[in-house]
Amino acid sequence: MGGCISKTSWSNEEPMHRPCLGMGCCGSKMGKRGFSDRMVSLHNLVSIPNRIIGNGKSRSSCIFTQQGRKGINQDAMIVWEDFMSKDVTFCGVFDGHGPHGHLVARKVRDSLPVKLLSLLNSIKSKQNGPIGTRASKSDSLEAEKEESTEEDKLNFLWEEAFLKSFNAMDKELRSHPNLECFCSGCTAVTIIKQGSNLYMGNIGDSRAILGSKDSNDSMIAVQLTVDLKPDLPREAERIKQCKGRVFALQDEPEVSRVWLPFDNAPGLAMARAFGDFCLKDYGVISIPEFSHRVLTDRDQFIVLASDGVWDVLSNEEVVEVVASATSRASAARLVVDSAVREWKLKYPTSKMDDCAVVCLFLDGRMDSETSDNEEQCFSSATNAVESDESQGAEPCLQRNVTVRSLSTDQENNSYGKVIAEADNAEKEKTREGEQNWSGLEGVTRVNSLVQLPRFPGEEPKT
C-alpha cells in the first residue's frame, strides 16, 4: 500500500447478495430484488432492530456524542448488534471534516456497514459454505489444523470484505450527485466482534482501545488501532512519492498536515480518509489498516472515539473512566464529560472539538437496573439521526481504578427530510453556542483542514 492509489482496479459493480440481517430477510419473497434496493434506504435503516446511531444504549453497549464549539457536530457513530447473526456486532465512529463533513460522516455511517455485509456475502459465496463454521472439537492434530485453517480463512474473508467495502464507499462518495466531497471527508474506525474474534478497519485519526485485566487483575489499556497521521514515516513517504507535501505550520509544529503540491491548502491533518478527493491524487488514500485480534476472558470492553477525546485524554484515562463508571449505560457519556472538562482546563482559549464515544462491553451485559434519571438521558430505541442530549449537572466521577498502558505494534442519492431537520436543529444550537463563545478570541487547537485550495486559473475570493 505504499503507492498512490487514487485509481484502483476493483470493480465498480456492487454485489447484490442478500445477507441475513437478523431480520428474517433470508428466504423472503424478495429474493430477486437487489440487496441495495431493499437496504440502502434511510427509512429502512431506521426500522432495523438493535441498531443505534444516537445517544443511547443497547444490550451490550452505550454511545454518546456532544457537539464542540466549531459548528455543526460532524461526528457520527453506530452500534449494530445481530449484524449478520446473533454473535456479531458492528461498531463505528466517523469524524467528518470540511464544509460537508457532517454529511459525509453520516453517509458513511449508514452505507459502509451495508456494503460490508453485501461484499462479505459475495466473497463467501465464492468460497462455498457458511461463514463461521468451525471444525468439531477433537484431540487429534488434524482437527486442530482444520480449525486453524478455518480461522485463517475467516480472517482472510473479513480482511477482503473490509478492503473492498472501504473502496466501494469511497467510489460512491466520488460519484454522489448531491454530496460534494472534493474538500470534505471523514475518518472511520470500525470493528466487527464475532464471538471471540475482533476484526478492525481504520482510516484517519479516530481510535479504538481495549480495556483488559493483567495477571494481577489491574486494568490495562491496549491501543488497537494506529492513528494514521501524515507524520508516520510510511504515510509521509507514500504522500511524498505522489507529489503531495507534508509539513507543520509554525504556530502548531506538533501537527503535520498534507498539502497540495501547488498551493498551501487544504492542510489535512490525516493521511487516510473517505472523500477529500482534492488530495486523492497526492497520496491520501481510503485503504483501511486491517487487523485481527482474538479476545480473551481478561478483555473487558472496547472504546471507540473521535480525536476530540484523544486530543485531551490518554488511553489509560479513558479506560479508567469506563472501568470506574457506576453505571455501564453512562460510560460513554462519562468519557465525553471528562474530555469536555479537560478541554476547558488544558486549552481554555481554544474551541473544543466534537466528541463521539462508543463503549462495547465484551461480556454482553449492561446494567441490570437503570435509574429514572439515566432512562431520561439514554434511550434504547433506534434513532434516525444523532441528537445532542440536554446537558444537566455534570455527574460526579469517582476514579478508583489504576490503569497501565500496554502498547502494541499495530500502528444516495437523498438524505431527505430527516437529515434536513437534523441540520436545522444543529445549526440553531451552533448559533446559540457561538453567542456563548462570542468573546473568545482564541484559536481552534487542531482543525482537520486549514483552508480550501485554489486551483490555477481560479480567482482568489475576496
UniProtKB/Swiss-Prot annotation:
Highest classification ranks of the organism: Eukaryota, Viridiplantae, Streptophyta, Embryophyta, Tracheophyta
Domain (PPM-type phosphatase) ranges: 60-362
Binding positions (Mn(2+) 1): 95-96
Cleavable signal peptide: none
Keywords carried by this UniProt record: Hydrolase, Magnesium, Manganese, Metal-binding, Protein phosphatase
SUPFAM superfamilies per UniProt: PP2C-like (SSF81606)
Biased segments, Basic and acidic residues type: 424-434
Entry's cofactor comment: Binds 2 magnesium or manganese ions per subunit.
Function according to Swiss-Prot or TrEMBL: May act as negative regulator of GCN5.
UniProt similarity note: Belongs to the PP2C family.
Residue numbers binding Mn(2+) 2: 95, 307, 353
Biased composition annotated in UniProt, kind: Polar residues: 376-385
EC number: 3.1.3.16
Cofactor dependence: Mg(2+); Mn(2+)
Organism the protein comes from: Arabidopsis thaliana
Reactions listed under catalytic activity: O-phospho-L-seryl-[protein] + H2O = L-seryl-[protein] + phosphate; O-phospho-L-threonyl-[protein] + H2O = L-threonyl-[protein] + phosphate
CDD domains in the record: PP2Cc (cd00143)
GO molecular function annotation: metal ion binding; protein serine/threonine phosphatase activity
The protein's assembly and partners: Interacts with GCN5.
Ranges where the record places region Disordered: 369-394, 421-443
Superkingdom field: Eukaryota
Protein's name in the database: Probable protein phosphatase 2C 1
